[in-house]
Structures are given as structure tokens and as C-alpha cells.
Amino acid sequence: MKNLILILPLLMLTGCVGDPADALTGPRLSPVGSGLRTQADPIPVTPRMRTPVSYRSTWDDGTDLYRDPRARRTGDVVTVIISMQDKAKLDNKTGRSRDSQIKFGLDWLMDVAGWADKGQTTANLSTNTQIKGNGQIDRTEDIKLSIAAIVTDVLPNGNMMISGSQEFRVNTEMRVLNVGGIVRPRDISRTNTISYEKIAEARVSYGGQGNLSDVQQPGWGHRIYDAVAPF
């Protein structure tokens, strides 16, 4: 009984291999390049050189009359169009069975100094193992929305890193949309928009915070138990 009391805490500690924080906050996105930071940094802006303006003139020499409106510099804004219609259905079944049997027999006859003895020995050994597994996934996603993102950095090859977020609050429910990734200037359309499937290392997160989200999630005590339970 004492050994059982000592073994139970050790078994519970084996469930601590994962990150317990995920049980409270949910899965976290992997970083893009330098990473998507939880705290918003100051938006980088390329300083613009001011040119002298002639007084009593309606023309400003610093005006970009023929400049392409597409985002190309740090601090520019580009609109990301997200139109996702994905369906996935997986059905996996695995089975394994093994049966082995060993039979051993021995007969002997012995006569020593007039004393006779004979006998028979038989030994049987058999094993049987069987494993079956079944898994099924049926998922359907339909998301259509757009979000404005800011160019946070321009890579040496000309590609740009973008990051954007939106927050919608309805009563006590907050909806948060985050998007980030790396885009090529050539993939940006003339209307300064880009489709999400042309974003490399795309990170799209859409979730909520509030009373409704709290009701849909299990309690924090249950989540902690699931994080440390070894079974």
C-alpha cells in the first residue's frame, strides 16, 4: 500500500511533459520571421523627405502624382482578402494480430541398479496479442473576410513582412482577428489587395473572448487536470 501511494504521484507527474499553459490559453501560433509579438510594438514608418514648397502655388513638389498605390515600403498598408472554403475527411483504421504457440515434450526411461524409472514431461507456451485502432476526422470551414495589414519590414530580396489585427466588440463578446506572413510585391493587385493563399508562412487567427467563449470552454480546474493527468 505504501508503494502504491508513492507511485501515484510519479504517474501524475508524467502528465506534466506538455506545456500546462496551453491548457489555459489554448494553442499558440508559431512566429513568422522575427515573430508575432503579443505586445504591439510601435509601427515602423519610413521618414519622408520634405521638399520646399513654393508659396502661393497649388502644386506640391512632394506629391506622388504617378506613384503606384500598392504597398512597397515599411509602414504602408495592404488589404488581405481571406476567402477559405476547406473540407477534410479522414478515416483511418489499423489492426494488428499475432498468435504464437510453443509445445515441448520429453519422454525418458532410466534403469539404475535394478531401479527403473520412466516418465513424461510436457510444456506448452502460447501467446496472443491483438491491437485495433480507429480514427475519423470530418471538418468543414467557410471563412470570408478582409483585414488591413501593415508592412513591418522589407527583406533584402524585396519581399515584405506584414502583420495586421482587428478587434470587434459586441456587448460583452470580443472577436479578434490576426494575420501575418511574407508577401511578394508582384502578388499585390492594382487595388492594393492580396489574397491569403499568396502569403508565405501565413498565420491567421480568428477567435473570441468574453462570456460566450467562457461558457463554451471547460473550467480552468478541468483544463489543469487534463494537462497533468497521465491517462
From Swiss-Prot:
Protein family according to the UniProt entry: Belongs to the FlgH family.
Keyword vocabulary terms for this entry: Bacterial flagellum, Cell outer membrane, Lipoprotein, Membrane, Palmitate, Signal
Subunit composition and interactions: The basal body constitutes a major portion of the flagellar organelle and consists of four rings (L,P,S, and M) mounted on a central rod.
Location (main, coarse): membrane
UniProt entry tagged with the keyword tRNA-binding: no
Designated name of the protein: Flagellar L-ring protein 2
Pfam families on file: FlgH
Signal peptide: 1-15
Topology with respect to the bilayer: Lipid-anchor
Gene from which this protein is expressed: flgH2
Lipidation (S-diacylglycerol cysteine): C16
A GO BP entry: bacterial-type flagellum-dependent cell motility
Top-level taxon in the UniProt lineage: Bacteria
Region called Disordered, residue ranges: 30-54
Record lineage: Bacteria, Pseudomonadati, Pseudomonadota, Alphaproteobacteria, Hyphomicrobiales
Lipid moiety-binding residues (N-palmitoyl cysteine): C16
Keyword NAD annotated: no
Organism the protein comes from: Bradyrhizobium diazoefficiens (strain JCM 10833 / BCRC 13528 / IAM 13628 / NBRC 14792 / USDA 110)
One function term, GO molecular function aspect: cytoskeletal motor activity
Cellular-component GO terms for this entry: bacterial-type flagellum basal body, distal rod, L ring; cell outer membrane
Localisation per UniProt entry: Cell outer membrane; Bacterial flagellum basal body
Role played: Assembles around the rod to form the L-ring and probably protects the motor/basal body from shearing forces during rotation.
